[in-house]
Amino acid sequence: MTIKVAINGFGRIGRSILRALYESGRRAEIAVIAVNELADAEGIAHLLKYDSSHGRFAWDVRLNNDVLQVGDDNIRLFHQSDISMLPWQELGIDIVLDCSGIYGSRADGEAHLASGAKKVLFAHPGGNDLDATVVYGVNQHLLTAEDRIVSNASCTTNCIIPIIKLLDDQFEIESGTVTTIHASMNDQPVIDAYHKDLRRTRAASQSIIPVDTKLAAGITRIFPKFCDRFEAISVRVPTINVTAIDLSVTVKSSVTVNKINELMQKSAATSFRGIVDYTELPLVSTDFNHDPHSAIVDGTQTRVSGQHLIKTLVWCDNEWGFANRMLDTTLAMAAMGFK
């Protein structure tokens, strides 16, 4: 059965999801039937075809009025600001992938359901009242058919949670801190401009900019036992894609660098294959652009202090890796059936 999906919000993640669907060869499993995006159709088609991070799209992209033609597929375009007015029932939509960055509450999810969708997957963290928050590779097996309004967490949560799980299962984490070194995002100006966050008034290309992050809350959402045991900070750096995460944890077991790297390398080839990767090559951030993994552990940067303090560096393409996990979670939700 082919799952019929609609994408609400066709920005960085929305477009990456559609591109990843075609590049990964999953079109027999998932079909994008519709896109809702306030931007004009010409801009939608142009930015799908040409991308500053991911290059030219290999498929032909054409416009026929408000139909986006990708290869031989026709995708309906809507420009509706009121999600309750979207024709999901008429189109037979199974799952809405909400990538707007605006909607994320249970009420927002219910509006999609009221419009006729069977399930909703948010491409960003949601409230505690959602049916589930999924980090694929870690807890998707807990999904049930009753989970209709789901969050796929965030790109950084998807990056760090598998690594925390591996370290905790093997060495028993006591506490930790996380520093996210994140590529610039579209809420930052090219030159100084007004923003309610005064640090984000500054030009994205000229500074390393500290920003607020809810990553610690995202960790405890997946692992409640770590409540008040993790803290996180985030800085934005003047690159347009790929993020690094500096994870430091204290553990009960005595550890060595070799033990940690052996664990990561083995897990990348077995239990977390396709989710976690491992490298000891002398790479830099741009080398991980367009990488579909949630996390790539840089074994050259693993450190241990006093046998119980671990520091690791983990890379991710914060767009492409997350887009691929959106597809994975979509399939996992569909596998539970529709009520």
Swiss-Prot record:
Its EC number is 1.2.1.72. Pfam families: Gp_dh_C (PF02800), Gp_dh_N (PF00044). SUPFAM superfamilies: Glyceraldehyde-3-phosphate dehydrogenase-like, C-terminal domain, NAD(P)-binding Rossmann-fold domains. One of its GO terms (cellular component) is cytoplasm. PROSITE patterns: GAPDH. It is an enzyme of class 1 (oxidoreductase). Substrate binds at residues 154-156, 200, 213-214, 236. Homotetramer. Belongs to the glyceraldehyde-3-phosphate dehydrogenase family. Epd subfamily. This is D-erythrose-4-phosphate dehydrogenase. It comes from Photorhabdus laumondii subsp. laumondii (strain DSM 15139 / CIP 105565 / TT01). The lineage of its organism: Bacteria, Pseudomonadati, Pseudomonadota, Gammaproteobacteria, Enterobacterales.
